[in-house]
Amino acid sequence: YYEGKFWSEMPDLNLDCEAVRAEFDEITSFWMDLGVDGFRMDGAKEYFSDNTTENVEVLKWFNDMVKAKDENSYIVAEVWTDRETYAKYLESGIDSVFNFDFGDGDGIIANAVKGSSESGAKGYANVCGKMDELLSQYNENYIDAPFYTNHDMARGAGYYSGEYKAAQIKTCLLY
């Protein structure tokens, strides 16, 4: 028997186990020796299901271990939850958390382009400023990681029902 949060064929890792952490160390060394200079930490909210404190500790350990090998490495975590919670993950010292408020069909980018929420460029800039204030409380050196869509969401162009210009604008808002 093992715990499989996402799928019965995908066992969860026991991140309290020193042997598992040692394996992480070896795996990161392997990839970094090949030139990899960053890591995406998938499903970080579920390392210890919905236990932000323990999850932040794991990310801090991972961040410290990776940055000891190369201080310029980049680490981003996927923490699909509300902004107040995912902001706390930056306390771990990682560089970024994916900014889920920006993604999806009702996200900040889509709503700004559609003019349906804090419409237009001024509203978008206002939201970006508020997000910066929140995230920098937890890590003043964070790098924002907004995105429009990902592999767990519908494709972005479909949010506009054939509005080609709107699809172009939303992509520009990421830069």
Regions picked out by a protein language model, each given a short descriptive name:
Residues 1-34, 44:
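Active-site-adjacent "subsite" loops/lids of carbohydrate-active enzymes
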